[in-house]
Design a protein with these regions (language model features):
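C-terminal beta-sandwich/jelly-roll accessory domains of carbohydrate-active enzymes
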Residues: 488-491, 507-579
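Active-site region of glycoside hydrolase catalytic domains
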Residues: 121, 135-341, 362, 366, ...
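Bacterial N-terminal signal peptides
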Residues: 14-26
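Aromatic-lined substrate-binding rim segments of carbohydrate-active enzymes
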Residues: 75-149, 311-325
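Catalytic-core region of carbohydrate-active enzymes that cleave or remodel glycosidic bonds
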Residues: 315-328, 354-451
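Aromatic- and carboxylate-lined catalytic core of secreted/periplasmic carbohydrate-active enzymes
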Residues: 409-526
């Protein structure tokens, strides 16, 4: 028996043992077991969308491994304890096409099995990242039998006919082979994990799109580009016209809201002939007006929309093949447009950036979440753009420093995020990792966060150390958070978060750091608001365990909550009003 088969059987036996235990504990017609055995899925809760695992909503406190880490179980072995110490509950890890199908039709899942076993041994969950045809706008993770056969698996062509190092999404054989491999992976996950649910979600491809060109100029792509826009896309746009993102709606309107036509007739001009895309990290020379048009909008719109549709159709076929085997939630991620590379082709053209999210929703209904890898300074703006059109917020790549810790807390509280994940956890994992301390507090209040998602009783702010106060309205109160640091104390991070949960009339749970929090009446300016009781404490198994009762100097001017600069903490406050 080879190691792969032995590993598979061991995992299968463990899964069956787990199921037997659940049934034994829930003997009434196996009802509890049936609930638990439903695969992870997305489910609406009020205005929020939640990830449901084993019958309960699950908040992903994630981190992504470096791209090559999961290619070696020996490399991972000493890393697992550090991941646990980082207070994660989920690890995002690569599964690459080249390693599971080194020869066409021969699959090897021993790395996948080892990854699952490692996660289980450390009480962690997994989000699998399928690196198939694309990674970061290039094609480097497919098997050699794909790379070496460009006649069967063609590459994107530049305007002058040069081959780019990325597979074209117009290659039928590429799509079929990718989908077949992905289906085999999902079938294997169902066989070894369909009852344990170690794997929560799957990312399909990675940051796909064309770099160094705004679109594919190959023969197949050019034929499609010169033809009509597919009726299914036009029908979708017409049916959702009033709900389209404004970038796309305004563009379509400006071009006459045509119900049919060629790509350029419907969506406007593409890249001017002969315009050369420079190195991807630099923007072409632009006037100020051109830059403002490109930034946060659609520049050379038809090229990006055309490629978005084709990538979406390709990815949808791959996702459908996988979901037919095991219907885990699936998402796609993207490299975002940025100020210093704002034209399509200086970032991957055709990926699910916010301005083309409706194209992706039309073309890839098998994908449940469109996600941005948010490293840009405009974090709040990007999150707001991704929660449009019913899209849930999941952040698969971002920062893991103090700023990232604040972003995670804010995303959970402000936008009902399903999860947050910094990239490259290998380098920094451990209890002293900035995000670890924030995740510890998030873990404590996760039951509250999940309970209050989608019902308007939770919000959050981001406060800059030298910035203005931030104010929100919640539960009949105006809440103002001001940056604060005691003289002689530690220097606070440049940005912190405050999370506010309304527990009922005049009662709040607040998470914060390096800030003072003030409450005032949101309905009657003549009313004063007093602090009835203030407790610091922790949550243990969902129950509040009070520590100190705060008063005096710990409540500045007897009217504010004070959060120390050293770390995030939790306070529980009851308020009263007086004239």
């Amino acid at each position: 028996m080879n190691p792969s088969t032995r590993s598979c059987r061991r995992l299968h036996a463990l899964a069956l043992l787990s199921v037997a235990s659940v049934v034994a504990l829930c003997p009434v017609q196996g009802r509890c077991a049936a609930d638990d055995l439903a695969p992870p899925h997305l489910q609406k809760s009020g205005t929020a969308t939640q990830l449901v695992v084993d019958g309960r909503p699950f908040l992903v406190r994630g981190a992504e491994l470096n791209n090559s880490s999961a290619s070696s179980l020996d490399y991972l072995r000493p890393l697992w304890p550090r991941l646990v110490a980082s207070r994660l509950n989920a690890v995002l890890a690569t599964v690459s096409w080249e390693l599971i199908e080194p020869e066409e039709g021969r699959f090897d899942f021993k790395l996948v099995d080892g990854l699952i076993e490692g996660a289980r041994e450390n009480n962690l969950r997994l989000v699998v990242l399928w690196f198939g045809s694309w990674k970061n706008g290039k094609s480097t993770y497919q098997p050699l039998w794909v790379k070496a056969n460009q006649a069967r698996f063609p590459l994107v062509k530049s305007e002058e006919g040069r081959s780019l190092n990325t597979l074209t999404p117009f290659g039928d054989a590429t799509c079929e082979s990718d989908a077949r491999a992905f289906a085999a992976l999902m079938r294997h996950l169902r066989e070894v994990d369909g009852r344990r649910h170690t794997v929560l979600m799957v990312q399909v491809e990675n940051e796909m799109g064309v770099l160094e060109e705004s679109r594919d100029y190959g023969a197949a792509a050019s034929r499609e580009f010169s033809g009509p826009v597919p009726a299914e896309l036009m029908d979708y746009l017409a049916a959702h016209k009033d709900a389209l993102v404004p970038e796309l709606r305004d563009l379509w309107t400006a071009n006459g809201s045509r119900a049919s036509g060629t790509w350029t007739e419907v969506f406007g001009p593409g890249k001017p002939a002969g315009k050369v895309i420079p190195v991807r990290t630099l923007c072409p020379p632009m006037t100020e007006q051109e830059h403002e048009t490109a930034w946060r909008g659609l520049f050379w719109p038809v090229d990006e929309i055309f490629m978005a549709w084709r990538y979406a159709r390709f990815v949808n076929k791959v996702a459908e093949a996988g979901r037919a085997e095991y219907p885990l939630p699936m998402y796609v991620n993207t490299w975002l447009q940025q100020r210093d590379h704002a034209w399509p082709g200086t970032y991957p053209s055709g990926g699910p950036v916010p301005q083309v999210m409706n194209i992706w929703q039309a073309g890839a209904p098998a994908i449940g979440i469109l996600s941005g890898d948010i490293y840009v300074p405009e974090f709040e703006e990007e999150c707001a753009r991704y929660v449009r059109c019913g899209n849930p917020l999941f952040i698969p790549e971002s920062r893991g420093d103090a700023r990232g810790a604040a972003q995670a807390i804010w995303a959970f509280g402000r936008h009902d995020a399903i999860g947050y994940s910094p990239f490259g956890i290998d380098r920094v994992a451990g209890p002293d990792f900035e995000l670890a301390q924030a995740y510890d507090v998030v873990a404590q209040v996760s039951p509250l966060i999940l309970e209050h998602q989608g019902n308007g009783t939770m919000t959050a702010v981001l406060v800059d150390h030298e910035g203005p106060p931030q104010s929100v309205r919640l539960g009949g109160y105006q809440i103002e958070a001001r940056s604060s640091a005691r003289a002689g104390g530690p220097t606070p991070p440049e940005r912190v978060a405050g999370l506010f949960i309304s527990m009922g009339p005049n009662e709040f749970v607040v998470v914060g750091r390096a800030m003072n929090v003030y409450f005032s009446s949101a309905t009657n300016p003549a009313e004063n608001v007093g602090l009835g009781t203030v407790e610091e404490g922790v949550y243990s198994d969902g129950h509040w365990v009070p520590g100190r009762r705060l008063n005096g100097d710990e409540t500045p001017e007897w009217k504010a909550l004070r959060f120390p600069a050293e770390r995030y903490s939790i306070q529980h406050v009851k308020l009263y009003r007086y004239q």
